[in-house]
Amino acid sequence: KRWYRGDFTEREMNGIIAKFAPTIKLSGSYAERSLPEILDWLKADNIDALESLSKNLRIIIEGGPGTGKTTIAKAYIDKFSAQRGLYLCWNQLLAAKMKFLLKRRNLVNCDVERIESFLIKISGGEISHEDFVNRSISSDLLRRMLLKFKSSPLYPNYSYIIIDEVHDMLDIGAIEILDCLSAIDDHGIQTGRFLVFYD
């Protein structure tokens, strides 16, 4: 017996392609423009999900790579675009990507920095790259430095702080930054507004 068959119809071909072709959703461009689009991309049922998150001033989110943490950060920055914010991360690629995404959306009120660059810049020479490599920065030095920065005329008066990849930064300033810079008053983390992501 021969099982040879002639050309497939267009409908049959589309059915075959649908069954065997991988479904890959490219998310690298983060082309979502609005909160509903972002929630749709995240497979959220409705806008209430992110809205309820934004009502809490202190949010910590765990999620592996590709779970939408950067998209949530972008939506958060977009929602609070009239306020001054600080986005900190560990790696240079993520910082560059976030700068690009925010610039493309004309979201100019959020400073994007690597934590190392940020702390070296505000330290006035008290810490260096080697201090980060050796993990030799004391909590007391960080607190003194951050409080000095917060009381200086150069402090941008951040309304919120986002820290991405916090698991890489817990021993080099993430807690001190949240405690010293995210609070409106002197009660630190208890009264600050922040969004923290970790894997």
Model-derived regions: residue spans:
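The feature marks helicase ATPase cores and/or their adjacent C-terminal helical subdomains
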Residues: 1-199
